[in-house]
Amino acid sequence: MGKYVLGVDLGTSAVKVSALDHSGQIVAQESFDYDLIQKQPGYNEQNPEDWVSGTTVAIVRLILNDHLDASNIEGLSYSGQMHGLVLLDENKKVLRPAILWNDTRSTPQREEIEAKLGDEFVHITRNQPLEGFTLTKLLWVKQNEPDIWAKAKYFVLPKDYVRYRMTGNLAMDYSDATGTVLLDVAKGEWSQKICAALDIPMSMCPPLIKSIDLAGTVTPAYAEFSGLTTDTKVFGGAADNAAGAVGAGILHPNMVLSSIGTSGVVLKYEDNADVNYHGVLQFEDHAIPDKFYSMGVTLAAGYSFTWFKKTFAPAEDFTDVVASAAKSTVGANGLLYTPYIVGERAPYADADIRGSFTGVDGTHQRYDFVRAVLEGIIFSFRDLFDIYEENGGDFDTVVSIGGGAKSPLWLQIQADIFNRKVVSLTNEQGPGMGAAMIAATGLGWFDSLQDCAETFVHFGKAYEPNPDNVKKYEKMHAIYKQVYQQTKTISEQLLDYRRAEL
């Protein structure tokens, strides 16, 4: 019987725990769902105990149902949903439900941070103080729940709380710490200036560790609870985007990730902390020690296609609808789609912009609209590539995951619009794979995450850009880039109309 590592993927709706062997093969996998607490619009919370019990149930199932010998589980690590605020008292007991990344109640606190710190905040953290980040949530509790705040002695993020319950040690890894927007990225330490300006005790900030650092071993109490042994080593882990980048092999400067889920992410490996995108793109510590990544988010990437299919092709198969785009031409016969149907994050931080089809002609067929949606999502990603190129970014390979990697046609569209080689993964497992790789590297199975990727990460067919298509898409993207400014005022007026009618 071989030795294993566990990758714990702590998501927003479920936890998935994967057991992998030395060759990177998944030998067993279990998951457990948990609930979201939505007390009113804009509020999204979870009970941290649900994460602990869900993770434990998944581990118990691996041991009992999948017959995994606990003595052969050498180590484990985590991928965690980012930004969620977990407040603990002096005895490290949870004080209130966790406020999650998708909670938007803290707009007044964001405005306060901007007023007090201005551009200096972005200079220190490399990020804007968005409602999704942890700091605004801390301030919201401070200002709206003074009794809770008076008892609060520590804050951690979701995976950190699960790790604490397993090991008895409080810590936060750098990749998650940058997402709190309390970290001085250049110095690699909690920002005294930000804490002082906002009257947040530095003592609340947990110790910082690297993703591959040993955070402890399983306690006797948790061993009895879960079936793991007290010899099981527990490593720091990473934020879900960092772990996802590791699992996709984004471990070299020449590589960029193109991820199409409900939202879309373009993520680039960064070598040093000197790169500054002035808050237009998020800038975070990577799971690789002393390395970083930048990322931009398209809010409605896969959701654009889901909306289109639900509205115009509800009874048809996803694959067939995507394939129909091949009947159209490069550039969708002169039809453009902007995927701003729920607002946009990057490069335009604009909650009121809305999507559009531009250039609709009486000769257009449904397949032209399908292709326009596929292309429009990638044009939005191309906007982010332009930012990289303007800042001297040099990369030649794009790793595509999610919905965009499931269609050869869509992979070729990406290669042509990006004008770069695009590859998919043959063993796409998302952040859970990255978490397992962190544990494997921490244990010394491999010298580095890059070495681990040589064994654990496998790429599929490479799609090379077609020079003729590249030229056509360059013309279409130049037109696409004009649509935002041309429709911004119209979108605001239409949104005002809709709100007045509600």
UniProtKB/Swiss-Prot annotation:
UniProt KW keywords: ATP-binding, Carbohydrate metabolism, Kinase, Nucleotide-binding, Transferase, Xylose metabolism
Molecular function, one GO term: D-xylulokinase activity
Annotated site location: Important for activity: D9
EC top class named in words: transferase
GO biological process: D-xylose metabolic process; xylulose catabolic process
Superkingdom of this protein's organism: Bacteria
A matching Pfam family: FGGY_N
Protein name: Xylulose kinase
Matches recorded under CDD domains: ASKHA_NBD_FGGY_EcXK-like
Induction context: By D-xylose.
Active site (catalytic residues): D240 (proton acceptor)
Coiled coil region boundaries: none
Catalytic activity: D-xylulose + ATP = D-xylulose 5-phosphate + ADP + H(+)
EC number(s) given by UniProt: 2.7.1.17
Protein family (similarity comment): Belongs to the FGGY kinase family.
Protein residues bound to substrate: M82, H83
SUPFAM superfamilies: Actin-like ATPase domain (SSF53067)
Function: Catalyzes the phosphorylation of D-xylulose to D-xylulose 5-phosphate.
Annotated source species: Levilactobacillus brevis
